[in-house]
Amino acid sequence: MTKLQEMVTFRDVAVVFSEEELGLLDAAQRKLYHDVMLENFRNLLAVGCQSPNKMAPLDTTGIRCLPLGQLPCWQMTSHDVNKLARAPEDGINTPGKGPHLLEQCHSSCHWGAEQPSQAPEDDGCLENLPSNHSSSSDNQEFLSGRAQSSWSKAHFSERWNHEKHCPQTLVKTKSQLLAPGVNILGCISHHDHNILHKRDKVPSSGDCDQVIFPMTLLTQHCVYREQKAYQCSRGQEVFSDSPSLELHQQTLLGKKSPVHSTHKDTRHSPSVPIQPSVHPGRKRYWCHECGKGFRQSSALQTHQRVHTGEKPYRCDSCGKGFSRSSDLNIHRRVHTGEKPYKCEVCGKGFTQWAHLQAHERIHTGEKPYKCGDCGKRFSCSSNLHTHQRVHTEEKPYECNECGKRFSLSGNLDIHQRVHTGEKPYKCEECGKGFSSASSFQSHQRVHTGEKPFHCSVCGKNFSRSSHFLDHQRIHTGEKPYRCEVCGKRFPWSLSLHSHQSVHTGKKPYKCGECGKGFSHASSLQAHHSVHTGEKPFKCNVCQKQFSKTSNLQAHQRVHTGEKPYKCDTCGKAFSQKSSLQVHQRIHTGEKPFKCEECGKEFRWSVGLSSHQRVHTGEKPYTCQQCGKGFSQASYFHMHQRVHTI
């Protein structure tokens, strides 16, 4: 066991909340705060005991009576407390009458010239106890209910008022002793004092004006900073005190509280190690790189590896390095297959407690993490952080090959396979390879025919979730994709990309046969059927075939008689949207097709094509009977009637 390395004052262990913070605490948290501060002050005495073999000699009862103290409580150091413990050997004599141990914190505690110019931030004086209080059983309710509430409120006020004297009388005469069973500053109560006097045959409390201090308990409370006796039941972490363990367990459970720990009196329980009650939220060690604070120097040293990149812990199986031994222990479970954390609902195992905690929310439906921008909720904090990049447009992961950036590291890994050509996912049915697991899973449904995504509106099923989401916009009318040039909106990104070529004139997809350009790959594929003569889309009614699905759909309306496109001016209906657009020019008088030779204008492109033959002399329609040629099909049909008469 190691000795104390430095003096400890109450300022070092006290924690003070502002008035605003105190207002946020409920009754239970205020009581907890009171208990924490009280326990901290009690254990300040324990800090002063050095080590057991250096304690002052004990009397036959094992109890040392403490004399009058001279310092205010906030100035008490371990040295001062130790001096009080050895008082009889130092020649300090406590009279049989009047006040004793620290009778006044400093009865005229004005902040004068001999005092600090400013009150300490961490005040810890106790409020005056009722002067009429005695040790009788009639006063069992002392420090309970409203009295305790007002006492704790005054006890932990935000800061000292320099115009007030210190309200504390730590321990007064026997007529003003603490309530039975209440231990302050490590002193036993008057009630316990009586018991000890009777048990050990020492003068009764009526003959003794001193508050006695059990030095055996003081010895138990000595601080051994390197001792670690509290181990987490869910992992291998070990802590030097129970508050730190409790704080760690609350972190695992995702709990947060303004008061960081609870303190239970374990002085009389031999099975639980006695540890100091220094508040676990105290941070004494600070990182010079980023300013982050830590309660232990070892935690700071571990954190600094984030900045240095040091990874001293290596996996024997794969050679991967880690900055913390706990991370290495968790990683080893990847190789061993160990999954110590089991879901009680479905039995699924996990390598980490945090993963189990996140999984359990699937069963409970809990989503505690809420996006402040859009209100969307998530079951995992990591999912929330990832989602927030949608709003911030942050893309921290950059491809070294092409410079493209991604919001997720997983998406970057998948993208890099475009450059490497890696396709680790192989289909056993057809041998096709895929760069991502999601693409592979979607492909497998081609063979199985599975369509797990069902539209509740029209009943249509889809094999891919992306296709299902795109389809739903038909019913909702949602158009999330907006053209920045003209403001037109589209339900699908593909439609927006096709539209943007109207403004840019860009047609990146070229036909290898005729050189014609297209703005979209699907348009080029449809055009290829012109050269190949392929017509893969067949009408089930008349068996007519078409090169495009849109042409087949328009044709099928011939059989159904459906005419969904209606003219708002005259009410005439059409089976095709293009036919409606041409018809509307009759009402508007629009003639968009103009002859470059003579300037004549036409409503339809077919009219312009027929007219241009007047200038070119082209006569594509030839009579097989007499060989006469015609520039228009209508003239050709009229001529054929001459031969049939």
Swiss-Prot record:
Zn finger (C2H2-type) location: 285-307, 313-335, 341-363, 369-391, 397-419, 425-447, 453-475, 481-503, 509-531, 537-559, 565-587, 593-615, 621-643
Compositional bias ranges of the Polar residues kind: 129-144
Residues passing through the membrane, by range: none
Domain of life: Eukaryota
Residues annotated as domain KRAB: 8-86
GO biological-process terms attached to the record: regulation of DNA-templated transcription
Entries under SMART domains matching the protein: KRAB, ZnF_C2H2
Keyword Transcription regulation: yes
One Gene Ontology MF term: zinc ion binding
Subcellular compartments: Nucleus
Any Gene Ontology CC annotation: nucleus
Predominant place of localization: nucleus
Keyword field: DNA-binding, Metal-binding, Nucleus, Repeat, Transcription, Transcription regulation, Zinc, Zinc-finger
Region (Disordered): 112-144, 255-280
Role description: May be involved in transcriptional regulation.
Family as reported in the entry's similarity comment: Belongs to the krueppel C2H2-type zinc-finger protein family.
Name this protein carries in UniProt: Zinc finger protein 235
Organism encoding this protein: Mus musculus (Mouse)
